[in-house]
Amino acid sequence: PFFPAMTDDQIETYTQISVSPDCNEAVIARAKELGLEPVPGVFTPTEAFAAIRAGATHLKLFPAEAASPLTVKAWRAVLPKHVSLYAVGGVTPANMQGWVDAGVAGFGIGSNIYKQGATAATVAKAAKEFITAWRALKS
């Protein structure tokens, strides 16, 4: 959600998380009030710490492709250990290992699985490639 009122709409979908594109402290606060886990988008340490001060314990590094696993490694050195960081944007099965090695807890994946006009078979194939890569990382 981009605005606190949009967070209210998520309750009707029975969601447990509230993913947003930026570090909007009002959205984080409203998500917490509603019992949702906020996952704000951040790109700088300043944004990350603002989100943490507002109550977020999960952060979406976006767009991750404009940063790097080295960025994550540096952030992990200063972020509280209880804060999870997720790479979103530009993640591929081939680069997941580097992100995990640097300290991400997981990924948000969209356009590398689904593109407008894609067939169900194409989407399924792409999703399976990510699942296979993730399972290989966890074994």
Segments from the language model and where they lie:
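Glycine-rich beta-strand-to-loop/alpha-helix junction loops that act as flexible
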Residues: P1, Y86-V91, F107-S111
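C-terminal helical cap(s) of enzyme catalytic domains, especially alpha/beta-barrels
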Residues: A31-K32, Q116-S139
